[in-house]
């Protein structure tokens, strides 16, 4: 399967709010700050074996930047950022960009479907009821100290092991999650904000990656 190559934006999750349509309908949206996405490197087939654009987002103190990275950023003429993200794109699109160029929210348009990737909120060590929606045991009537246990996790000597993938207690959350086909409800070009319909992974202040949707659904009845 060929990987879809498209340019995206790095952003910060500001939080959730709601907006109203002209008809008065309330739409829950997540506000994403995508300001100051700056190009730090253009990778080409001749120099790197593939075509991509490296983007920096956020800011970082000079004292917290390693010397190799400082030299890399100085070559591009950009300030250090919290994150360096690489987007694989077509060669003709890469030719339109240059080091130091700023990619703004006008990369997208209202109504466009996007995929948003982030790190989900960590929940710590959780049991199977919270982690996998297991049912609990009976509260009484013959049940003694087995109210929230997950049950059997395997068999006896044959096979003599717990099968991989068995749903058990463990660390919940703090995983990379991608939510697909979210619609851009509004774009605030002045403040460099994207308002995306629905929820996106992560806590307030978390970093997210916004890219054009790879599984856009065809309009029903369209030819």
From Swiss-Prot:
Modifications made to the protein after synthesis: Methylated by PrmB.
GO molecular function, one term: structural constituent of ribosome
Leader peptide range in chain numbering: none
Gene3D superfamilies: 3.30.160.810, Translation factors
Region Disordered: start-end pairs: 137-157
GO-annotated cellular components: cytosolic large ribosomal subunit
Superkingdom classification of source: Bacteria
InterPro entries according to UniProt: Ribosomal_uL3 (IPR000597), Ribosomal_uL3_bac/org-type (IPR019927), Ribosomal_uL3_CS (IPR019926), Transl_B-barrel_sf (IPR009000)
Pfam families per the UniProt record, alphabetical: Ribosomal_L3 (PF00297)
Single Gene Ontology BP annotation: translation
PROSITE patterns found in the cross-reference section: RIBOSOMAL_L3
Modified residues (N5-methylglutamine): 157
Keywords noted in UniProt: Methylation, Ribonucleoprotein, Ribosomal protein, RNA-binding, rRNA-binding
Known function: One of the primary rRNA binding proteins, it binds directly near the 3'-end of the 23S rRNA, where it nucleates assembly of the 50S subunit.
HAMAP family in alphabetical order: Ribosomal_uL3_B
Subunit note: Part of the 50S ribosomal subunit. Forms a cluster with proteins L14 and L19.
Family in the record: Belongs to the universal ribosomal protein uL3 family.
This protein's name: Large ribosomal subunit protein uL3
Organism: Burkholderia pseudomallei (strain 1106a)
